[in-house]
């Protein structure tokens, strides 16, 4: 069936306008991008499958959405000329007949280009036919336009264009080559047209990436593992042909949960590969092909690229089958390199920095692998599979911009396996390739669904599978050991269980030393070859703003030559020298009005460098060496008018700041994929649950449903709902109602979502565990009851109902985990027995550890700290005489502010230390509260230098220096049992005084003193009692010490 040719007119003019704007703006010295060209020539010949995606047809797809063979485009800075054929004829003799029959709409190119006339940018279409004279006239007009536009003309010298139409143009153009200078325009097309993608382009690349991920994880991995497990023989070429055929299986792609419902499998095609390699022969270049060797265990490399609506995505993975220790170590290092590169894929990064940081890490950590590391860490990707002008090597000075798409590749080639005795596995290569979008603050990895972690890529078909099991058992043993601990609380500090098992304490101290050493080493490896932020603060970037593009956009009121506040354009227009001068609100600091005599004065202060040393002194400017206007003062007799203007400017400034703040708050909110509802059956539901944070309106219970790729909370009012996708779930918790008023299921998200007008990372579904109680005293039932039978029955019923609630919610949480198991969703339950109270926000709450986190889920604001994100914990205010201490968590992401849990009772100190040690978190302690803002600025400013100077050891050093004094102080003031008994007797005697005792004591102090035993007598009694109990002085001293 013929394809209906419809050119998106809006997209055409938007893209052409942005291209022309970039062209006109390129007036820097040396004309770095466009090379000072006055015109650009894009020539398309006949369709050529071998050169299907070059810059010339990429320009066709970018502007028109289609490739039109035998077409010439000539651009000047204000107009576009198109020379094309009217119908199929001698100009298309070598064009593939199947292509033309499938796209009969292409036979009349002029017809489809005709609607582009009359737009905001002039487009002239010159139609040619079989008549040579007519074609010559069209070419002559284009040549005249090129000569008039300037000496330099942009061409694509590396692109090939064949066929009669192309040959005719080349002959015609040869006549003016002596009059013009040809400039390679491909870098300009890359930067101004293809690099930064709009929304439609990003959606196409994302869908292509999801198709790649699905084909890799849902098909190739299953096929590969089945062949190896069943020990079947198959060549790389045969396996790649199987994958090749799978692209025509529309049902397979329809089943992939990540692909949207509107995804059209008919629009996908291969961009590269598929390529499968194993058995010691590897080629990591894009030109590689699958050979006829058999698939072998060891290192298996698989890669391919898929094109959707002409936009490409690429993926490559390395699979380790029964790997050696050195192979596992090198792959783990490759993951470290991958994270290092990904961390800097963000707006404003220089392209060469990505490669330089990766190679710097190789040189610092494994210099023997430097010669094996790939020559670049990726390239630009889009319509072209690999943009040669955006290769991420050590020489590319281009700046990454938000909206760019890149293929990021880290790899090791031809590494020798010293442990191998088999020549087929003596040499191996490894590669990880992902397609990513450059974001404001980091990358969006489109191909992340095909896992790259060790668990996802490792396969053990031999005897090496067994040793992996103890890891999980070890974790459970630690948790069980902790839950058996019982803390006794007493009234007096002297009676608290301050004694610690010396053997356990020594083991814990030794373990903490190992963790501290490990942290320092990890820090040096992680930040090798990196540079920190200046002064520990990420520098702000200047954001351009514009009040009006043209004079005719100015408001009509400017003719009155009065001060005018244009709220729509966020601009203040001031008449200067008889002309209206606009000042954008972003340039204004504040405005104030004052009176002096019969005049009112309006003073407008502008932002400029060096205005002070306050918090806002880091205001960025485009050129700080330029001349700046500091302030402007206007005088008028119209007092009310100036007062109104000052108020309007103040309001405008407030609104601008509020909008900026709202935009900043919403930066990390990403648009979720659509929830795929279950249609063929009723979804599993949990009724009568409340939502936190709640939806706007009346508080009423709703129900939670489990669908194919997420949860949906349905409100009974106004058909409102909240969707939570499994792919966005970081933690899933179930907390029973024991000792609580509610039973709950809590979801902690990777990226925040919007619920109503609130941004949140935590979504909670709960039901109250208690019912209203009624006093039945005096009613008819009560008359026939004796004793506490009724109260006993109510308690029994309460226990039964709570147990039923726990069973219902736990079963539903397990069903959620089962539905989301492909996304790694698992249920976690807090350990109440090892919980401790503290103040993470405003109120004192119970904080409970889980297997993977530390949580407080009972009352908002919630606390969820992921354990593997913690760098170190520090215990503050640990000193004798204080009833509580504070706990500070520092995260591996040093830009993330530390989390404080304050006012933890000192009785919990040993329990907290035991728990931290059991989950392998390094901790230190000290007597004072530290200024963590200053500390983290120091760390961020030079992280490598920080770890080189000892890292977090300064916290431990502070603890050690205070430890001796603390012990002495405690042992000096702590009472022995005999002294405490004597003190208690004295207290009892004091309590027998009458109301006038205080007055008598003040009048006759000496008599009161003589009436009791002195301290020497008490000391003698205490020693005698100790001797009787068999304790000498040394043992008693040990007992008193902590």
UniProtKB/Swiss-Prot annotation:
> Acidic residues composition bias: which ranges?
959-972, 985-1017
UniProt-listed SUPFAM superfamilies = Creatinase/aminopeptidase
Q: Which intervals carry biased composition (Polar residues)?
A: 480-489
Query: What spans are recorded as compositionally biased (Basic and acidic residues)?
Result: 467-478, 504-519
A GO MF term: nucleosome binding
Q: Where in the cell is it found?
A: Nucleus; Chromosome
In Swiss-Prot or TrEMBL terms, this protein is called FACT complex subunit spt16
Q: What species does this protein belong to?
A: Aspergillus oryzae (strain ATCC 42149 / RIB 40) (Yellow koji mold)
Q: What gene name is listed for this protein? A: spt16
